[in-house]
């Protein structure tokens, strides 16, 4: 149905979208998202996180109860895993007492840094465990996942969902994952191994992986909307009127865009602790950057030993926090680019309606109002990642983060030298 004749390439129909979805890259991207989601879901079910069950019939997640006996066994195993190195905790407490009463100068500095890092690890681990088990967080996650499924389904039905996985983001994430795996393997065989530190890294990565997949889904939603508007503009550039079925699509498009923004605000407000935890890794990063500088520039070890000690000890804790922040910053920059492109396309669409549709028609007035509210909403509540204290995590922040790490680590090295500390030998920890 149309107010004018159809051209052979008139509209990007559902059939065309289904053909497009069978292309190898679309199949690959679709399987990546589905595979990642099922892996995260399977881990949650296996370890009794969240107590949510996916209902394939309704395409929604629902609260469920696990088997009572098996659930109790899993809880006992979790407690044992956390409490197993009790002797090491006792030694750690004794060491803290001795350092507080006896240690001074650069050794006191190193001890204080270690204590700060350990305190942050324990605090973040506590929040991670609460997030994975608390009923309030379960409700938040249930709402978020159901919104993601609903928006994806709506885009699929009305516009044709095009999945897009940013290759640069994925490469950076996989590089971080590889470095983290090497670091965890090294940590596992350390004589001072503590299961709480190991769990901190593993659970933080599990939660961040889910957040990263969510960010990629956001970018896919924007890509789908942008693609639809581009084809709308191409289709009507040389037409005298606008096809009727497009009227019924543009209003739901604005509604979905508003729903996407509200969802991201909801997610950002409820998992702000996760981005804060990522930022607080800066202490781990600084402390290990100091060790890396001392070992690479001042230690008298052989080059082969230096490389091994750096790789085995401090390289991972330096690189992983920076890569976490870099990923969040890159996502924010891509959100900004997508929103700018979306604004430009909406301006062009509104211009087409002003020229090709009578201005007193209801659709033209509604479209103008929706466009105005969208621009205001994007200005007041842009789609972005906040890191700490409502600071936006973008490329500028990432650069500030890296510079802060380097300058602070150099200051700590300078203080160690000025107090006569020993830096002539490589160490992986102090």
Swiss-Prot record:
Residue spans, topological domain Cytoplasmic: 1-31, 101-110, 190-277, 328-396
Extracellular side: 53-79, 132-168, 299-306, 418-430
Localisation: Cell membrane
Highest taxon of source: Eukaryota
Transmembrane segments: 32-52, 80-100, 111-131, 169-189, 278-298, 307-327, 397-417
GO CC aspect terms: membrane; plasma membrane
Additional information: Gustatory receptor-like proteins are divergent proteins which do not belong to the canonical gustatory receptor or olfactory receptor families but display some structural similarity. They are predicted to be ligand-gated seven transmembrane domain ion channels.
Record's protein name: Gustatory receptor-like 43a
Gene it is expressed from: Grl43a
């Amino acid at each position: 149905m149309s107010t004018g004749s159809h051209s052979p390439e008139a509209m990007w129909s559902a059939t065309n979208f289904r053909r497009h979805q069978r292309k190898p890259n679309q199949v690959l991207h679709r399987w990546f998202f589905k595979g990642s989601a099922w892996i995260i879901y399977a881990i949650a079910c296996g370890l009794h996180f969240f107590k949510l069950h996916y209902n394939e019939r309704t395409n929604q997640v629902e609260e469920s109860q696990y088997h009572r006996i098996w659930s109790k066994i899993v809880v006992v195993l979790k407690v044992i895993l956390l409490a197993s190195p009790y002797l090491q905790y006792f030694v750690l407490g004794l060491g803290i007492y001795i350092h507080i009463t006896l240690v001074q100068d650069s050794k006191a500095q190193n001890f204080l840094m270690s204590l700060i890092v350990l305190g942050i690890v324990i605090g973040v681990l506590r929040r991670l465990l609460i997030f994975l088990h608390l009923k309030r967080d379960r409700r938040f996650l249930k709402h978020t996942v159901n919104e993601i499924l609903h928006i994806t389904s709506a885009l699929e039905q009305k516009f044709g969902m095009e999945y897009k996985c940013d290759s640069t983001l994925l490469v950076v994430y996989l590089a971080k994952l590889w470095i983290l795996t090497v670091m965890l393997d090294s940590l596992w065989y350390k004589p001072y191994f503590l299961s709480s530190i190991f769990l901190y890294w593993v659970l933080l990565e599990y939660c961040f992986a889910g957040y990263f997949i969510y960010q990629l889904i956001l970018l896919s939603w924007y890509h789908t909307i942008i693609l639809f508007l581009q084809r709308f503009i191409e289709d009507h550039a040389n037409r005298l009127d606008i096809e009727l079925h497009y009227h019924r699509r543009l209003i739901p498009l604005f509604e979905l865009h508003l729903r996407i923004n509200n969802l991201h605000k909801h997610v950002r407000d409820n998992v702000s602790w996760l981005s804060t935890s990522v930022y607080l890794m800066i202490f781990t990063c600084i402390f290990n950057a100091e060790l890396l500088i001392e070992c690479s520039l001042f230690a008298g070890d052989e080059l082969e030993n230096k490389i091994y000690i750096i790789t085995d000890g401090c390289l991972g804790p330096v690189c992983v926090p920076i890569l976490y922040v870099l990923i969040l910053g890159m996502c924010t920059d891509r959100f900004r680019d997508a929103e700018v492109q979306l604004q430009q396309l909406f301006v062009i669409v509104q211009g087409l309606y002003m020229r090709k549709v009578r201005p007193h028609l209801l659709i033209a007035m509604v479209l103008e109002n929706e466009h105005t509210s969208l621009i205001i909403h994007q200005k007041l509540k842009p789609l972005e990642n906040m890191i700490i204290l409502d600071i936006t995590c973008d490329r500028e922040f990432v650069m500030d983060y890296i510079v802060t790490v380097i300058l602070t680590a150099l200051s700590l090295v300078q203080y160690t030298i000025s107090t006569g500390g020993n830096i002539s030998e490589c160490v992986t920890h102090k």
